[in-house]
């Protein structure tokens, strides 16, 4: 169950709070969502998987919630979207028999290395697989959720730990050992809180001050991160610091976004099909 469905706080926005916040945004509606702040060029470049994990980590404790059973599949969905955005994979063109996003296979476009171990490992699996598989099947295979013993070789192991090590190398996390009564656990507390706050502010702005009410006008990576953060059940961490009025608006706008029909949105001009295919897979699971 995701944040949007198990959240106990009031999530219905009153007309007065909606009107109040929208009036604050009038001067920002015409701003292009792709326009970055001047300092953005100096920001650390993170993959979608690193961003999702960073949003899900408890800052001081250095681990994700034990009750979060969504983030594993969310990270695998992020891998597929990241590969598509880097021009390595794509969905096969629609045909009369295969029009739906979830019916179309994931095809290899380029096997050139990305420099990221997880991405390159996934790329090797996709290249070596015959027959080709759908987005939903790939998420299941990469997560290890398959009854076919011959398909277990495609499971990506220790994904969170490997992503966390990347974030340690980028100076955002550190590594510690914590004792939990019967066992020791490696944790990764956040050391660069500025980077995490920047990431959270980016998502908050995308559904508040920079809201454009049209996914086709949103920055592709921001749209992908919203979809993945929702599917990974980490949006609560992003919006919890907002005032009640802004929290309600942010959650409801995100809810409206992820409840759009992926089949319709995926066919629009310049749409990134993989984002909508991943969302469709999560909606079905």
UniProtKB/Swiss-Prot annotation:
**Keyword Transmembrane annotated:** no
Top-level division of the source organism's lineage: Eukaryota
Q: How does it sit in the membrane?
A: Peripheral membrane protein
Residue ranges for the region (Beta-hairpin required for oligomerization) are: 176-187
Per UniProt, the ranges with Basic and acidic residues bias are 10-43
Compartments where found:
Golgi apparatus, Golgi stack membrane; Golgi apparatus, trans-Golgi network membrane
A GO cellular component term found in this entry reads: cytosol
Gene Ontology molecular function, alphabetical = cargo adaptor activity; phosphatidylinositol-4-phosphate binding
User: Which Pfam families did the record assign?
Assistant: GPP34 (PF05719)
Task: Give residue numbers for the modification (Phosphoserine).
Answer: 112
- Tell me the tissue specificity: Expressed in a subset of tissues tested with higher expression in salivary gland, small intestine and skin (at protein level).
Region spans: Disordered: 1-43
In its keyword annotation, does this UniProt entry include Phosphoprotein?
A: yes
Its main subcellular localisation, reduced to a broad class, is Golgi
Q: Where does a 1,2-diacyl-sn-glycero-3-phospho-(1D-myo-inositol 4-phosphate) bind?
A: 67, 76, 157, 160
* Gene Ontology terms describing biological process: Golgi organization; positive regulation of protein secretion; protein targeting to Golgi apparatus
Q: Which UniProt keywords apply?
A: Golgi apparatus, Lipid-binding, Membrane, Phosphoprotein
What the protein does comes down to: Phosphatidylinositol-4-phosphate-binding protein that may antagonize the action of GOLPH3 which is required for the process of vesicle budding at the Golgi and anterograde transport to the plasma membrane.
Q: Give the similarity note.
A: Belongs to the GOLPH3/VPS74 family.
User: What is the protein's quaternary organization?
Assistant: Homooligomer. Does not interact MYO18; differs from GOLPH3 by its inability to interact with MYO18. May interact with ARF1.
Q: What is this protein called?
A: Golgi phosphoprotein 3-like
Q: Which organism is it from?
A: Mus musculus (Mouse)
């Amino acid at each position: 169950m995701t944040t949007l469905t198990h959240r106990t706080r009031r999530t219905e926005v009153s007309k007065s709070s909606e009107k109040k916040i929208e009036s604050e945004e009038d001067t920002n509606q015409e701003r292009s969502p792709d326009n970055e702040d001047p300092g953005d060029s100096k920001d650390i470049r993170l993959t979608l998987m690193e961003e999702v994990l960073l949003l899900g980590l408890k800052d001081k404790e250095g681990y994700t919630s034990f009750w979060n059973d969504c983030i594993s599949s969310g990270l695998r969905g992020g891998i597929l979207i990241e590969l598509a955005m880097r021009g390595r994979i794509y969905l096969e063109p629609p045909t009369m028999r295969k029009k739906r996003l979830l019916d179309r296979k994931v095809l290899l476009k380029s096997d050139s290395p990305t420099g990221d171990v997880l991405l390159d490992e996934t790329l090797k699996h996709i290249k070596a697989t015959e027959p080709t598989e759908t987005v939903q099947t790939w998420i299941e295979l990469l997560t290890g959720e398959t009854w076919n013993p011959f398909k277990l070789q495609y499971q990506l192991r220790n994904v969170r730990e490997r992503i966390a090590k990347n974030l340690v190398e980028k100076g955002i996390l550190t590594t510690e050992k914590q004792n939990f009564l019967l066992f020791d656990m490696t944790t990764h507390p956040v050391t660069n809180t500025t980077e995490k706050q920047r990431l959270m502010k980016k998502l908050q702005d995308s559904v508040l001050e920079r809201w454009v009410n049209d996914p086709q006008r949103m920055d592709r990576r921001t749209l992908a991160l919203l979809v993945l953060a929702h599917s990974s059940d980490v949006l609560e961490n992003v919006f919890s610091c907002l005032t009640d009025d802004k929290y309600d608006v942010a959650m409801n706008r995100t809810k409206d976004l992820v409840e759009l029909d992926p089949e319709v949105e995926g066919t629009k001009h310049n749409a990134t099909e993989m984002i909508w295919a991943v969302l469709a897979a999560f909606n079905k699971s």
